Amino acid sequence: MADNLTAEQRKKNMQNIKSKDTKIELVLRKALWSKGYRYRKNYQKLPGKPDIVLTKYKIVIFCDSEFFHGKDWEVLKPRLQKAKNSDYWIKKISRNKERDIEIEKQLLFEGWTVIRFWGKDILKNTDECVQVIEETIFDLKMEEDFVEVEE
């Protein structure tokens, strides 16, 4: 993962990385808003402050960047081992992955439906991501209707 950036350039790049209102979040939020869905963003009342929360349906959505959330970790990790500061990055991303699992378990335990999208999927297939969300809403409504009929 060698690059041609100086330490100062690398530092500046890293400082410019946002943790909320990222491009991938904005793209997905705009698509949901245009379909009439209203949501909370970075909802602090829930574990992990999910990027998008559809409180009406008890759905949380995380928009995960590939690097920081360790997509294809079995490929990325060996590449990171060759990089400067490899111990830091491997530890950081490993912990992010663990935290993602912990938060997801906690949210599921609290009765929330958790959806995760990779950033590139949001950017390349926004409509498909929205469709996944809409299908999840449909499934939840069907479950709700089924429970009402049983009672």
Name what the model sees in each region.
Residues 1-116, 120-151:
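Nucleic-acid endo/exonuclease domains
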